[in-house]
Each structure stands twice: as structure tokens, then as C-alpha cells.
């Protein structure tokens, strides 16, 4: 979520403008144990299991709750803003906050409940960390929406870590943090000053079977409104949502920040927008939001309300507000890093001062893929990135696929990855890097049946 962060376009919410594809589950890896224990529960593994011990080690770290941590500071700023923006008649905050929810969710919670198509690329093993075919580490905190709405909540924030298989560089990490919010209102509340107006069109039947309600999950969906809602209801809800989110943005970035709204598509909201700010001569995406799809509310047992939702990445905000250059720093326990931040004054956001600049070490790794296997057709670079993380941990700063080659005679494909090593807290020797590099090469042979060039 970032000047370079811009390429991350939707770390806060699942994007749906990527190509649709399907992926069959391969046989279970021989390295997977028969069972995994995560967050106090035991799960049987199967052919979908791809979560690694390295990734599981992050579960329960709760960096967003760690005192004097930059992510905790951003979390508190967001929570405090919503506490102030919405209060009941007694002056108490309307929004409740859930920041320790179990990150293990079902496929239904993460995808089906949010109307994400069955063939959407975000469901693939190459994108998510699956515990088994029915359970995964949540890819977004939006996964808890139906659960909380079904429990009777109508104004809430969910904050926590989310997990995505991704590339390796200074702005991508397999675990990051999101804040998600939902606000629902009834007709009486929305039209308090205009009691003659309605939430829903007279022609709408109010059932899930209504073909006017069930729309294909397409980025060409009507950006004006959903068929069930009246235009008046949508416009009032849109106005409130945008007013509140612009207020949040100004609270974080200052009252004179330049901003703009951009139409977009999310499977779970319609219409949908992204909020961008003009920062250091670039437009920077800050958050995604929209009017909640009414199908989601109906599945939650709510039939007479309209709502908005938004999602934002905490790292995205913190990297900009604190001038933190590398996303790995959020996982550092170095006192030289952590001592720079304090929760005593949440509105005094210090700029990060580098502890030291350690040199990079760069090594290339080239290998032949097995016969009839190609990149993104049997071999996913994300699988290689996970392997590297498991072997080298945070000593790897960046990986890039720098070359692909198909032999004209044998038909075999070759790839070359450039791996940049740099520790955040000390200097790495070339000999140390070479040893780690050998371990990565050996693990690649064992895991992918490749031939090192």
C-alpha cells in the first residue's frame, strides 16, 4: 500500500482486476506433517497445505498491539478518530474494536461470504497460505465481516495481521496488517430528516433469488448503485462515508493534504472507490471503500439496512508517515529502531532515522525447470519466494526474476532469480551469503526437482 507502494494497489482489500484463472491442488508435499496446530487448534493437512513453519511463526506476534511500535501508533490513531467521529447520545463511542481475532478462517469466510468468484485468482494456492482445503490464514480482515454482522454488530473496526504469498522487496512482506471498518444504518437513521424516502426500490423483491440483485462479479458493474437500493440512499451513504474517510486522511496527513476519489471495483462493495493523496509529487493510494453489497448483509441476517465498508493497510500508512524505507523493519526487535517511537504523544510522529546502512550482497541463481514445466504453468515464482524466506529469513531484501529462457531444441525452460541479501541489523560477509545461497539452491533442487545451471 506506496509510491512504489502504488504497485501494491490493493494490499488493503483483495483486488479483482487481475486475470481469472483456475488452479488444481497438487499432491500433498511430503514435508507437510499430518497435522498442524495453529492458534490453539489442530488441523489435518492435505493437498492444499502450503503454509510454512516460517509463516506460522508470525501468528500471534500482534505487532499492531506492541507498545511503542509504529503499527500500534497508526492503529490507535485510526481507532481514536472513529471514536471521535461517531458517538451515541450519551457521548460514548459507537464503534467497537476487534484486534485479536483468530487469523485462521474458512474458505467461506475469506471468499464465499464476500462474493469473490469461485474462479478468482486470489483463491489460488499461489496467492494464499492454506492450512488445508477448507482453512487458510486470512488474506484480509474483511473475512470477519459476516461473522460480526451476524452477531448483531452494526459499527465496528477489525484490526489484525493478514497473510499473502507475494514477491520479495522493500514494500512486500508475506504478513502485514489491516484495519477494516463497517457501518450499517437503518432507514429511520439514514432518513431521519427525510422520513418519506426509502432504502430500497419498490420494484425490488427483497430475496436473494432476485436476478436484479445477483449481479456477475465484473469490474463493469454499475458504479451508480446496486439494483436494490434507491439512489437517495446510496448518495447519502456515499456522502457520509467520503466525509468521514477524508476526515481520517486529514487527521493523519494534515488538513491541507490534496486528495481525489477514483472509481474502482471490489467484489464485496458497489459502488466502490479508492482514495488517493498527492504525496511527494505522486498520487498515492491510501484506502479502498464502498457501499456494501446487500447480498452480504442478507447472508448475515440483516435485511433492512444499508452500509459502507473500508479497508486500509497499516504498513502503507506507517511507511509514509514515519519515512520507514523497508517493510522488514516492522518485524525488527532492534532497540535502535523501536526506541524511536512512542505512544505518549500520538500526534507527534517522528521520522525514522536509519540505524546504519549495511551493504548489499547480490547473487544470481539459475536453474532448469523440469520438462514441460514453465513459469506460471506448473511453477509459481511465489513458491520460490516462500522457499527463500524459509531458508534465509529476513536476510533477503529483494528477489527479482531477471531472465526466462526456453531451449529451442529440448523445450526446457530456464529461469534466473537475482537475490539481494542485506541484514537489517548487521553486515553480512560474502562467505556467509554464499553458504545461504548454496542452501537455497539445494532446497530448490529438493522441492522443485530443478537442475542448477
Curated annotation (Swiss-Prot):
Localized where?
A: Mitochondrion matrix
Q: What is its EC number?
A: 6.1.1.20
Per UniProt, what is one GO molecular function of this protein? tRNA binding
GO BP annotations listed: phenylalanyl-tRNA aminoacylation; tRNA processing
Q: Where is the transit peptide?
A: 1-27
Q: Where is the FDX-ACB domain?
A: 356-453
User: Which is a Pfam family this sequence falls into?
Assistant: FDX-ACB
Question: Where do the annotations place substrate binding?
Answer: 142-145, 164, 171-173, 178-180, 285, 310
Its keywords, alphabetically, are:
Aminoacyl-tRNA synthetase, ATP-binding, Ligase, Mitochondrion, Nucleotide-binding, Protein biosynthesis, Transit peptide
Q: Which family does it belong to?
A: Belongs to the class-II aminoacyl-tRNA synthetase family.
Quote the protein name from its UniProt record.
Probable phenylalanine--tRNA ligase, mitochondrial
What gene codes for this chain? PheRS-m
Amino acid at each position: 500500500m506506496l509510491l512504489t507502494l502504488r504497485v501494491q494497489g490493493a494490499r488493503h482489500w483483495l483486488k479483482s482486476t487481475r486475470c481469472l484463472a483456475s488452479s488444481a491442488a497438487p499432491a500433498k508435499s511430503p514435508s507437510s506433517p499430518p497435522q498442524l496446530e495453529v492458534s490453539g487448534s489442530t488441523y489435518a493437512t492435505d493437498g492444499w497445505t502450503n503454509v510454512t513453519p516460517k509463516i506460522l511463526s508470525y501468528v500471534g506476534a500482534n505487532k499492531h498491539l506492541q507498545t511503542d511500535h509504529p503499527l500500534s501508533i497508526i492503529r490507535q490513531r485510526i481507532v481514536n478518530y472513529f471514536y471521535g467521529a461517531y458517538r451515541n447520545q450519551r457521548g460514548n463511542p459507537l464503534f467497537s474494536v476487534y484486534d485479536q481475532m483468530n487469523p485462521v478462517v474458512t474458505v467461506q469466510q475469506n471468499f464465499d461470504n464476500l462474493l469473490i468468484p469461485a474462479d478468482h485468482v486470489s483463491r489460488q494456492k499461489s496467492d494464499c497460505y492454506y492450512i488445508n482445503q477448507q482453512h487458510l490464514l486470512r488474506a484480509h480482515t474483511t473475512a470477519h465481516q459476516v461473522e460480526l454482522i451476524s452477531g448483531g454488530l452494526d459499527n465496528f473496526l477489525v484490526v489484525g495481521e493478514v497473510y499473502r504469498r507475494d514477491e520479495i522487496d522493500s514494500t512486500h512482506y508475506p504478513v502485514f496488517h489491516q484495519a477494516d471498518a463497517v457501518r450499517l444504518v437503518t432507514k429511520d437513521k439514514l432518513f431521519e430528516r427525510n422520513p418519506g424516502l426509502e432504502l430500497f426500490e419498490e420494484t425490488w423483491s427483497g430475496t436473494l433469488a432476485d436476478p436484479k440483485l445477483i449481479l456477475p462479479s465484473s469490474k463493469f458493474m454499475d458504479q451508480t448503485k446496486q439494483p436494490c437500493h434507491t439512489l437517495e440512499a446510496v448518495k447519502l451513504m456515499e456522502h457520509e462515508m467520503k466525509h468521514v474517510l477524508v476526515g481520517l486522511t486529514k487527521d493523519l496527513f494534515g488538513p491541507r493534504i490534496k486528495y481525489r476519489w477514483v472509481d474502482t471495483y471490489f467484489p464485496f462493495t458497489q459502488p466502490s472507490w479508492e482514495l488517493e493523496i498527492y504525496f511527494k509529487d505522486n498520487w498515492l493510494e491510501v484506502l479502498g471503500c464502498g457501499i456494501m453489497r446487500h447480498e452480504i448483509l442478507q447472508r448475515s441476517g440483516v435485511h433492512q439496512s444499508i452500509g459502507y465498508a473500508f479497508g486500509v493497510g497499516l504498513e502503507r500508512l506507517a511507511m509514509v508517515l514515519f519515512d520507514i524505507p523497508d517493510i522488514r523493519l516492522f518485524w525488527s526487535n532492534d532497540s535502535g529502531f523501536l526506541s524511536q517511537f512512542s505512544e505518549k504523544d500520538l500526534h507527534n510522529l517522528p521520522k525514522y532515522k536509519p540505524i546504519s546502512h549495511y551493504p548489499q550482497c547480490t547473487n544470481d541463481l539459475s536453474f532448469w525447470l523440469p520438462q514441460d514445466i514453465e513459469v506460471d504453468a506448473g511453477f509459481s515464482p511465489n513458491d520460490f519466494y516462500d522457499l527463500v524466506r524459509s531458508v534465509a529469513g529476513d536476510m533477503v531484501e529483494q528477489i527479482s526474476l531477471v531472465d526466462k529462457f526456453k531451449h529451442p531444441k529440448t523445450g526446457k525452460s530456464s529461469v534466473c532469480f537475482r537475490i539481494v541479501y542485506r541484514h537489517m541489523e548487521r553486515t553480512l560477509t560474502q562467505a556467509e551469503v554464499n553458504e545461504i545461497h548454496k542452501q537455497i539452491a539445494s532446497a530448490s533442487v529438493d522441492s522443485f526437482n530443478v537442475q542448477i545451471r
